[in-house]
Amino acid sequence: SWSGSIMLGTGWALIDARIGSSRPHNHVAHQISLAIERDLEISGDADLIVPAGHAIAIASHVRHRLGPPGALVRSFYLDPLFRAGTRLSAGSAPVLLTPIETAGLGDIASGADAKRWASDYLDRSQARPVDARLSEVLAAPDDLSTARALADVACLSPSRLREIVSRDFGVPPAKLLQWLQLQRAVRTLVGGGGLADAAAAGGFADQSHFTRRCAQWLGVTPSAGLSAFAFEIVP
């Protein structure tokens, strides 16, 4: 089973983990994974070996699974909530990071370090701007439960919203809202709430719906994939 520690901020997460079992999955977040003590195996849309001491960037919406079980990995996750004005290319092939980028990832020791590294990474990656009408919505998404509500807050027609969200995030509005729902649910779980509390906070119909969505987006269920982690919430 998975174990380790998770540092969770707004739009980002840093996970130091011993790999457990998971299923191939993809998500809205971009993932950068560093092989700590032995080679890392990436399977899914692309089958790759990441040598120990190297890191790989897996773009959003790329189907993947990490291995082998028992290996140590440090993974950084970045999504549009970290910096609402920027977006990275979705669906591109995984790429190895430069030695400088890899060293910076390995040196992160605090929330401030993590946010600084993420900002530098976005700057180097030539992240492109998200439509300005969505920036305010992404900064305070808690009251949004439907694509219609998202369109109303952003002052967009439903059809225009679909065009913009698909262009900027690579998913339809409903999928973006599901990702935001999952984040709210996980934050509640991290804060000490039970599965029922987490499901309610995320706007899921019930615990099983939350569990299925977690497996779909993260490759693990809450009980199997998150229960053995120590969490730190970073403001």
Stretches found by the model and what they are:
Residues S1-S3, W12-P24, Q207-A228, I233-P235:
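Helix-turn-helix/homeodomain-like alpha-helical modules used for DNA recognition
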Residues L14-R18, W117-R124, R162-G170:
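Short, Lys/Arg-enriched N-terminal segment that forms or immediately precedes the first helix
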Residues G85-R87, L176, G225:
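Residues that scaffold the ATP/ADP-binding catalytic core of kinase and kinase-like folds
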Residues S110-A147, A151-A154, K175-G194:
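A short, Lys/Arg-enriched amphipathic alpha-helix from helix-turn-helix/homeodomain DNA-binding modules
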Residues R148-L177, A199-T221:
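Basic/polar phosphate-binding segments, predominantly the helix-turn-helix DNA-binding elements
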Residues D168-A205, S227-P235:
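Terminal helix-turn-helix DNA-binding modules in bacterial transcription factors
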Residues L88-A109:
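Aromatic/histidine-rich interaction motifs
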